[in-house]
Every structure is written in structure tokens, then in C-alpha cells.
Amino acid sequence: MTSKPNFLIIMVDQLNGTFFPDGPADWLHTPNLRRLASNSVRFKNAYTASPLCAPGRASFMSGQLPSQNGVYDNAAEFSSTIPTYAHHLRRAGYQTCLSGKMHFVGPDQLHGFEERLTTDIYPADFGWTPDYSKPDERIDWWYHNLGSVTGAGIGEISNQLEYDDEVAFNAKS
């Protein structure tokens, strides 16, 4: 009997592809990512169907454009009736697990995955949809400029540290 290959899908937000011509750029200190990339199959000509995170993830998971799956912004529900690669992997006998943010809107927070190791950093909801008739109340002040980077200062906690703590807490022996 032939064993199935294991694989790990890593999806990141807002990462410029020029950082990875043949692995992480030399000036980036990413020893673990560099080691992982050197022993992996990588998609060098990947394409995202949307520059927004939730529609991009829904398209990647479903193989459908936002116009087909209805996830056109970060507040749109990703219908549980749409099969994802996780459904297909489970049908092929794989064990599936999700960790990290997905911003799934709606009751289905797994979309074919058997388990989820971490909660979402902030579930998407209709509050993510800006009201363009009220520009002073929009949430995009932190999303479309470098203010959150240049004004950040020294951090005491990060989403990564919170995820690491949660994974350690929920680790199965």
C-alpha cells in the first residue's frame, strides 16, 4: 500500500512575492521558513482572486472566484454549501486541521476541516463592511496605510504569541 504524502498549506496576508524568488530574501531573518522552503514544493506563480484576505482565502479554499462563491469582502458569509479542498482531502482519507485566522462569517467555522487548533483572532462580521457614506466612521484608517506599523512602538504581546500560548494550552499529548 502506498502511503500518502503529508502536506502543510501556509497562507499569509499581504506578503509580496518578491520576498521569495528562490526562498526568503537574503536580508530576511527567517531560518525556519528558509528551511521549510528548501524541502518543499512551492507555487512560484500563485495568483489570488482578491486582494482582501477573506475573499482571497475563500477563493483559494473553494477554487471559485468571489463572483461565484459570494465572498466579495471581509464581511460576506462563506456558504457552508460550497465544498473546499478540506472536504476533498477528508474524502481521500486525509486528516485535516486548521490553525490561524480565516475570518469565516456564518455558523460554519470549519468548512471541511475536522478540527481547529486555535480560535480566530477576530471573527469577521458585518462590522467589517465600511459605510462609504460615513467616511469618518470607516475602519480602514488602520488598514490602508502604514499608521499601524509606524505608530506601533514596542509590543508586549502579539497575535503570534497569543496563538502560540493557545496551541500550547490545547496541545494533545
Question: Language-model segments: which ranges?
Answer:
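Formylglycine-dependent sulfatase
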Residues: 1-173
